[in-house]
Amino acid sequence: LPDSSFLRL
């Protein structure tokens, strides 16, 4: 999911 991308911060 693209939303999970913010968790990479």
UniProtKB/Swiss-Prot annotation:
Its main location: secreted. The modification Leucine amide is found at residue 9. GO terms for biological process: neuropeptide signaling pathway. One of its GO terms (cellular component) is extracellular region. Keywords: Amidation, Neuropeptide, Secreted. The keyword ATP-binding does not apply. The keyword Metal-binding does not apply. It is found in: Secreted. Transmembrane segments: none annotated. FMRFamides and FMRFamide-like peptides are neuropeptides. Belongs to the FARP (FMRF amide related peptide) family. This is Extended FMRFamide-3. It comes from Lobatophasma redelinghuysense.
